């Protein structure tokens, strides 16, 4: 039985046809594949930028298309186009698409249901240079369907690559991380209620999760791992991430126009000014000015949330859904937390 580390390595190594075949084999397809001729490629909607296209036949109606595209080919567009053509010309088959960019970074594993005029694609879309644990968990869940019948396997693919399974896992982890962060808070000589501690923990986590979306666009000093790198550097220098990094980042940088920033704030690099109120001190924070969260529980926020899941600013649409945390899913998770608190 493979470990999550080996599933992660499999995703990272899938830069060419052999790597795609290895993934398909893990999911239950035989290793033998056949090359798709140009006419069939056209029928299935494969773009001209395809370097290699092969077909694997699984149990019953299961089929996998393994596509190696040029390095700059947008795989989301490839997936939706192929899904539409397969639904139009071969709707009796149950499809899985595994596509990669030759010498590029993107990898997509997608499936769809053909029971509608325009199929809805559900997908795992990853950056092979930065595989996160939830990516490996998704591939492991797909591999667990290898012994299922064709209809049950396809149904499991739809569930695994859809948002619901990921949303449930994320919500459970979010609940646990908020509770642990709240319990670890120190407030000097002032005592806070359990509700206040929870509200403060939720506030800090909401800020960090918001920044996780911002950094995926490279808006935090052009560094898509800005938060993780600042945490690592702070630990190397003795720790105290809350006081030495989060406080000046939140209250001297993100909530301050660039021209008004002090030298310590400018040291973070090119950071946008966010004037929406999220990075303004709340009444509760002013009530507890000595609030501190220790490094070990902030580290757990990274380990159980920020580093574990893939964050995507792209929200789900009627015809596309990714196995990633998007703003809509995050909003629903916070709503559920607030309802649970009563």
Feature annotation, model-predicted:
Residues 90-94:
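Short glycine-/polar-rich loops that comprise or flank the Walker A/P-loop
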Residues 53-81:
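Active-site ExK catalytic segment of metal-dependent nucleases
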Residues 85-89:
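Short, charge-rich binding segments
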Residues 2-15, 26, 39-43, 49-53, ...:
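Preference for the N-terminal adenyl/adenosyl cofactor-binding alpha/beta module
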């Amino acid at each position: 039985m493979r470990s999550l580390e080996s599933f992660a390595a499999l995703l990272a190594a899938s830069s060419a046809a052999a790597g795609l075949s290895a993934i398909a084999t893990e999911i239950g397809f035989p290793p033998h594949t056949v090359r798709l001729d140009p006419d069939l490629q056209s029928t299935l909607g494969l773009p001209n930028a395809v370097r290699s296209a092969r077909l694997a036949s699984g149990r019953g109606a299961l089929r996998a298309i393994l596509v190696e595209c040029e390095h700059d080919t947008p795989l989301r567009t490839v997936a939706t186009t192929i899904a539409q053509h397969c639904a139009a010309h071969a709707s009796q088959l149950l499809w899985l698409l595994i596509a990669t960019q030759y010498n590029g970074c993107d990898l997509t594993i997608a499936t769809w249901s053909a029971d509608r005029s325009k199929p809805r694609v559900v997908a795992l879309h990853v950056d092979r240079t930065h595989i996160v644990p939830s990516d490996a968990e998704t591939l492991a869940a797909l591999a667990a369907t290898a012994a299922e019948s064709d209809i049950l396997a396809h149904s499991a693919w739809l569930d695994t690559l859809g948002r619901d399974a990921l949303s449930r896992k994320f919500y459970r982890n979010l609940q646990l991380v908020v509770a642990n962060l709240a319990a670890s808070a120190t407030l000097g000589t002032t005592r806070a209620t359990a509700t206040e501690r929870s509200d403060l923990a939720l506030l800090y986590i909401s800020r960090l999760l918001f920044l996780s979306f911002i950094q995926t666009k490279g808006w935090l000093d052009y560094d898509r791992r800005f938060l993780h790198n600042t945490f690592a550097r702070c630990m190397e220098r003795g720790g105290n991430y809350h006081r030495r990094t989060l406080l000046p980042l939140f209250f001297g940088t993100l909530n301050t126009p660039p021209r008004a920033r002090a030298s310590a704030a400018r040291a973070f690099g090119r950071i946008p000014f966010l004037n929406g109120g999220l990075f303004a001190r709340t009444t509760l924070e002013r009530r507890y000015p000595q609030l501190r969260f220790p490094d070990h529980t902030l580290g757990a926020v990274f380990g159980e949330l920020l580093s574990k899941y893939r964050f995507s600013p792209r929200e789900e649409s009627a015809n596309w859904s990714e196995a990633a945390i998007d703003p809509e899913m995050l909003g629903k998770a916070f709503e559920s937390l607030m309802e649970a608190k009563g």
